[in-house]
Amino acid sequence: MSEQHAQGADAVVDLNNELKTRREKLANLREQGIAFPNDFRRDHTSDQLHAEFDGKENEELEALNIEVAVAGRMMTRRIMGKASFVTLQDVGGRIQLYVARDDLPEGVYNEQFKKWDLGDILGAKGKLFKTKTGELSIHCTELRLLTKALRPLPDKFHGLQDQEARYRQRYLDLISNDESRNTFKVRSQILSGIRQFMVNRGFMEVETPMMQVIPGGAAARPFITHHNALDLDMYLRIAPELYLKRLVVGGFERVFEINRNFRNEGISVRHNPEFTMMELYMAYADYKDLIELTESLFRTLAQDILGKTEVTYGDVTLDFGKPFEKLTMREAIKKYRPETDMADLDNFDSAKAIAESIGIHVEKSWGLGRIVTEIFEEVAEAHLIQPTFITEYPAEVSPLARRNDINPEITDRFEFFIGGREIGNGFSELNDAEDQAQRFLDQVAAKDAGDDEAMFYDEDYVTALEHGLPPTAGLGIGIDRMVMLFTNSHTIRDVILFPAMRPVK
């Protein structure tokens, strides 16, 4: 047996022994009838204590004689004879406990406390004081075991280092890694901040179907499920767009939804098949109004959550404080591929030649607009590091957007990029029912030609438009990618609590 295999075998034996010992301790607690008590109540979390009392000296704390009750997971323990120090972790952070044998009821220290294990969940009462090193601590007068942990913490509090294990066992990741806990706290703050921002602007939050008979609102491959009661195949939604615009037809002039979308596509550092989007629709507005809204939203969130408008992402500082750059798609191609002759982007054969020269395989079903879009994505997208709006998307790749009044080959649409990736997509909505019907037919033709991401024909949506959709603008923002930016995370799995993973066999 190799040394590495021997070490692995020893580790398994050690773990099995520890599991056995912990279960024996639980069995003993069951015999005493105190295995899982539920009558302990805390009155502070660790962050509340630090916020209120870190600034006070020990003499002041002793004079105040403050008694508190806390609860959390025992992360470290230093036993020094008749006294010990414990690090207790709760939702707010950590607080130190000072546990002395003579200050607890008889037998608690030796017969109970010293037999508890790291990872156990404790309740503690006592008085606040500061150690000689100035650390805020609780001098315990009561200490109880609330939950017996049957498994040890990962690597004895050095954190869960295996990346895949962090995703599969997120609970261990959250116990062990401060960075992960902070990421998901920021995510929650972002969601709350978006909701507050939208309400302040007069928007109403709504909910639309997650299962749809006709998937629509985006070009993507859907997941299929079956409704037993209706004996009907249905699709997990790829976007809520068409339902939200039905609500605008119905008279709700400013609506938004934050919810999950599902797309049966690949998994990468930027893509998870189940992801969170915020979509909004605003009557009597155009795409320019939503450019302003998007810029204001990101600036507001950065200031409110991070306390500044400069955000560090990798080795780049993203500046949300200054006006965001605005380029047309063709301007971006020219900027990042200067040798491009702009006239070539108006000709199918010339554009196809450019695309093929930079390694793009041109599908038979693509028209000029799709080719130009693919060229943009290949030569420009990765360079859009600072916040940038790209406008003038071809109508061919924008089946739901309003055509431009001057040039009907392009639409009044923008995509929003930060850090070299798309974060948001917005446009003036197509409210011409006849034009929409024809574009749906074009999408059906593309699907018949082999494009499995082309849209279905949605007859009811066309009927809704025939009742009259006011001039409207819509916007979708990827929440997961937004969280990645605000937390300096470089894979989408780091910002989704339970990302899609292949099952372990």
UniProtKB/Swiss-Prot annotation:
GO biological process: lysyl-tRNA aminoacylation
Catalytic reaction annotation: tRNA(Lys) + L-lysine + ATP = L-lysyl-tRNA(Lys) + AMP + diphosphate
Coiled-coil regions listed in the entry: none
Cellular component annotations (GO), alphabetically ordered: cytosol
Root EC class: ligase
Gene Ontology MF: a single term: magnesium ion binding
Pfam families given in the database record: tRNA-synt_2, tRNA_anti-codon
Cofactors (names): Mg(2+)
Details of cofactor binding: Binds 3 Mg(2+) ions per subunit.
CDD domains linked: LysRS_core, LysRS_N
Keywords attached to this entry: Acetylation, Aminoacyl-tRNA synthetase, ATP-binding, Cytoplasm, Ligase, Magnesium, Metal-binding, Nucleotide-binding, Protein biosynthesis
N6-acetyllysine: modified positions: 114, 156
Places the protein is found: Cytoplasm
InterPro entries: Aa-tRNA-synt_II, aa-tRNA-synth_II, aa-tRNA-synth_II/BPL/LPL, Lys-tRNA-ligase_II, Lys-tRNA-ligase_II_bac/euk, Lys-tRNA-ligase_II_N, Lys-tRNA-synth_II_C, NA-bd_OB-fold
Record text on subunit structure and interactions: Homodimer.
Family: Belongs to the class-II aminoacyl-tRNA synthetase family.
The protein's name in its UniProt record: Lysine--tRNA ligase
The organism of origin for this protein: Shigella boydii serotype 18 (strain CDC 3083-94 / BS512)
Lineage of source species: Bacteria, Pseudomonadati, Pseudomonadota, Gammaproteobacteria, Enterobacterales
